[in-house]
Amino acid sequence: RQMCIRDSCQDMGFNTVFLQVRPSGDALYKSDIFPWSRYLTGTQGTAPSDGFDPLEYAVNEAHKRGMQLHAWINPYRVTNSSNDNGKLAANNPAVSRPDLVLTDSSGKMYLNPGEADSIDIILEGIREIVRNYDVDGIHMDDYFYPSSGFDDSAAYFKYQDAYPNKADWRRSMVTTLISCARDAVKEIKPNCMFGVSPSGIWANAGDTPGGSNTNGSSSYHSLYADTKLWVEREYLDYIMPQIYWYNGQPNADYNTLINWWAGVCAPTNVKLYIGEAAYKAASGSEAAWKGQNGINELSNQVSMCRQSQYIGGCLLYTSPSPRDRS
């Protein structure tokens, strides 16, 4: 299936594949830090019986086709559901270091972003990938702090004198991970790219100076990810905001957001790519995404990006979407 996807991407003119290799505190590659993913064998920690290494295979096949391969990780997430909490392998960092686990109100588990040891584990995982695989980039998804209730008071207690505002402390800890992750990548392989695909809204102008003319959930307030600061300080080689809305959408207009991000990135050396909701085209619930409307919307969005001097490209999420809806 991987080969078919890469052939399809090559035929359609794509130049880069982003492969998710750490969905939830696990690995789709041989790792001494994270257990083998259950998505491979059905049981976390169980290696493929034939020695298959998905990341090694994907890198080789992408490079054969003249495409780049970026390894995509979810840095903090340990489980997607509380139903998975009892299915973790013994060598999962959340099992060996339960003191680092943060659980949200739905029961999902995360490595606590407020713990320095959590950051160290994530950084070692990044170094392991860059050392052992010829990847062209390390890519982080949009999951940072949980978006629902959690208790991180014990971690905050250690920092509260320096950070009287807990929200500022949380953002500072995530920013530390981002800046250190870039350094970790560049120390091993200077030409390897590092980027993030955050929520399309940094903050709304109505509640945060400098925010976009929107009114939706934001990375700054909901996930404690100061993505605008990361661009301004050039902690990233590129940023790829997930602008999964349509032109004219109330509270989160596509055109408004790509122009806002263009304005943020233009004075910097950070490249701007746009994450497109290919999975919605022809199948979304809103009228703008249904049937031919959705195909036209996606096509128009890609054209708008191509016309902007500040946007370097688009990523279509997810991989089967353009093929299935061609």
Please describe what each predicted stretch is.
Residues S37-D50, S106-D120, Y163-M173, Q242-N247, ...:
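The substrate-binding groove and active-site-proximal loops of carbohydrate-active enzymes
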Residues P164-P209, S219-S285:
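Glycoside hydrolase catalytic-domain groove-lining segments
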Residues Y76-E128:
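Active-site-adjacent "subsite" loops/lids of carbohydrate-active enzymes
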Residues R6-D26:
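Catalytic domains of carbohydrate-active enzymes, especially glycoside hydrolases
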Residues G284-E297, S319, R323-S326:
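Aromatic-rich peripheral "rim/lid" segments of glycoside hydrolase catalytic domains that contact
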Residues C9, E61, Y110-Y143:
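An active-site-proximal structural segment forming one wall of the substrate-binding cleft
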Residues M3-D7, Y317-D324:
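Conserved small/polar residues in nucleotide/adenosyl-binding loops
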Residues G25-I73, K166-A181, I188:
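Aromatic-lined substrate-binding rim segments of carbohydrate-active enzymes
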